[in-house]
Amino acid sequence: CIRDSPLFFIGYTTVGTLAFDRPDTPLLPLPRILTFMLNMILVGVAEELVFRGIIAQTLLERYGTARAGVWKACLVSGVLFGAAHLSNLLGSAPFGVLMQCVFAASLGVMLAAIYFRTGNLWVTVFLHSAMDIAAMLIGGLYGTTSVAESVSGYDASRLVSVAVYLI
């Protein structure tokens, strides 16, 4: 069902954010938006090559292709992917970065599982880039804040609704 798709959730939350969070704030100029989008695509390519193409694949070879080995490779690569986002502490609020790390870790587990299931890194590159573009739209389209700072400003009801959806 389309409602169960992560892309539906991304689109739904993006439209809500664009429509209601900042109605009086002007958008960034189109060339800057397109540059951001290209940047997000390139980040998706680079992170997938490193975290799924190299790290997850190496872990899978180490732990084996039995069910337990696949799970272990997914979990370890996901935790490493989440930890890599700790570098955002240099410029963003700690709570937002913590939430971003938790999200990135769970996303890393999911993307590793998709990569192992499909055997196609381009599938995860597409999904990762689409999610990064959606995050950019939510956090930076208006040129006012980062994604981590956006998450820091969320009230409890918004964070709980995301948690319920993920469960």
Regions found by a protein language model. Name each.
Residues 25-37, 90-103, 152-160:
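Juxtamembrane helix-entry segments on the extracytoplasmic side of multipass membrane proteins
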Residues 3-50, 56-66, 149-150:
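Juxtamembrane helix-loop-helix connectors linking adjacent transmembrane helices
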Residues 45-50, 54-55, 59, 83, ...:
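Active-site His/Glu-centered metal-binding helix of metallohydrolases
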Residues 38, 76-83, 98, 102, ...:
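Hydrophobic residues within alpha-helical transmembrane segments
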Residues 46-76, 93, 116-120:
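Membrane-interface helix/loop boundary segments of multi-pass membrane proteins
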Residues 129-167:
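C-terminal membrane module of polytopic membrane proteins
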Residues 6-13, 78-87, 129-141:
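Aromatic-anchored segments of alpha-helical transmembrane domains
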